[in-house]
């Protein structure tokens, strides 16, 4: 049959032409049908569902362009896209597509209106959970209750003076073991890795006591967990939701993240068990009773919060936030100051003069270090950890004061990085917004009306790195004080410079995140006057 048909075709050229025309027509029809289907799908997506806010989506080159491609472009160039969008829509609402999430970006005039809304209307923890893919990275505890938030706000901040004393005590030992030996020569200094371990040591002492701070496995996992969780989140957000369980099953960082959480529960769980066994002891002096964040959470916990696994999980989350943000803050500032040696010398002199007056390292002493505070805030301005902050997820239909209706499920945020480049929102005077001016905020505070403004830990509608309102970062006062203590010690005890031919490293940008270049290095050498400065620092304990 086949041979016969083939011979017929060869004998009749017109028959071949008819077959060829038939195939071409069907291919064209199938191609046209496929294109029509894709166009229809994209048009429906572009028009959006009734629950999608009808505002301009920046970064989209065509209404036919798929959202995943827009999100991919944001992953690589989010900072520039947000800054350009801010210039165009500064006083308007616009949207950006971040991988899997459409974010509604609001002008800062809405901050005061939104900050007071109840959690039943807008949720900050839910926004963090969604962005961090909490079901994969273990963020369930932050939406189940606010025990950790309340413990920091109600106990750590009011007891900041005693917490700083603990930080200083732990720092004396940590400097000997964490920093490289550089007494006689310049040696390479892995800034972010070393500072992450240093911050983990100091914070862990305040969060869970001496036993936790000296547990090397805890220190390792408290610095590894943020890296693994971040890498896991970024990988999973690149693929559709339906594929995520399959990808997670073969993703090494997912399994490392879960392993970090299990190890944290084992380590902290052991401490909790021992403390509960000691609670009934009558021979313990008041001095022996634990006084740290873990104990404050244990005392206030109720229901499922009392479970050791729950408490340990919360402590790991707090450590994650502390280590990541504080080490980034100090690293960026150190890089900036080493690139501006005159400013570094001025700040070193300020720290020296304040401590030479005989003041102890307390909150009032740190307040006197205005140039150091200003340099940290300026460095943070140029390299905030996130391009957008003040994140909220709308839980109930929201009607803003100007009549704007926000649908349920909308993810709201503020363009923090772009706002920090807006000269109209910065203190008057100083160099251009894109330049590092270490004394920008110190000069502004010379005006008596601004004496309590423009500090690293203060928040306002124009400065949202730590958020603003009742959901602002509760640990910012501890973090800013810890950063100043660490940096002041480093400046008094060590000299720093860039390797030959190197300069201030560019930050790594990935989606909404601003990170340190992990390959960047400084050179470090102990100062000639380190011994006398160390003695002065010891008197300030």
Curated annotation (Swiss-Prot):
Its cofactor is heme. Pathway: Mycotoxin biosynthesis. Its EC number is 1.-.-.-. InterPro entries: Cyt_P450, Cyt_P450_CS, Cyt_P450_E_grp-IV, Cyt_P450_sf. GO terms for biological process: secondary metabolic process. Pfam families: p450. Keywords: Heme, Iron, Metal-binding, Monooxygenase, Oxidoreductase. It comes from the Eukaryota. Heme binds at residue 473. PROSITE patterns: CYTOCHROME_P450 (PS00086). It is an enzyme of class 1 (oxidoreductase). GO terms for molecular function: heme binding; iron ion binding; monooxygenase activity; oxidoreductase activity, acting on paired donors, with incorporation or reduction of molecular oxygen. Belongs to the cytochrome P450 family. Geranylgeranyl pyrophosphate synthase; part of the gene cluster that mediates the biosynthesis of aphidicolin, a specific inhibitor of eukaryotic DNA synthesis and DNA polymerase alpha. The geranylgeranyl pyrophosphate synthase GGS is required for supplying a sufficient amount of geranylgeranyl diphosphate (GGDP), the general precursor of diterpenes. The diterpene synthase ACS then catalyzes the conversion of geranylgeranyl diphosphate to aphidicolan-16-beta-ol via the intermediate syn-copalyldiphosphate (syn-CDP). PANTHER family: CYTOCHROME P450 (PTHR46206), CYTOCHROME P450 MONOOXYGENASE AN1598-RELATED (PTHR46206:SF6). This is Cytochrome P450 monooxygenase 2. It comes from Neocamarosporium betae (Beet black rot fungus). The gene is PbP450-2.
